[in-house]
């Protein structure tokens, strides 16, 4: 029973780290990256559709994304969706392809993005700690039901703390890498 709780907690902590990493990937750096446009929704025939379902996003060079729209009639909708996103991008139309030059980030904008990334990292840490709290409370319930001993609970708490620290360290490493990436000019 305790092994199941531990396994579940480790899986959930791993998912927290992965979710934090995915959230940080959406924060724009100076480099072009297709995942930058993942959060954009396009009004396609009256339905809000993810951009990657109506177009192919690729990298043209270090500071330019290319968006190849599958249906030519949707080019204006895709262009409008990209312009209205809060990413500060201005696409240029070239037939069925949109070229999106990424402007260089100002020092102030970089610092704003670092604040956003740090908040995401803190959210990830809190989620990991919540998983730890849930796992420990589950084991304490087992102890109250006389299904495990107090020593088992102490041993479990120590083990959970070790892998909690390991997962938080992963989040901190992801944060450090993202901060370095953001501060590159």
Swiss-Prot record:
Assigned keywords, A-Z: Cytoplasm, Protein biosynthesis
Assigned GO CC terms: cytosol
Cysteines joined through disulfide linkages: none
Pfam family, one: RRF
Residues spanning the signal sequence: none
PANTHER family noted in UniProt: MITOCHONDRIAL RIBOSOME RECYCLING FACTOR PSEUDO 1 (PTHR20982:SF3), RIBOSOME RECYCLING FACTOR (PTHR20982)
Protein name stated in the entry: Ribosome-recycling factor
Organism: Shewanella sp. (strain MR-4)
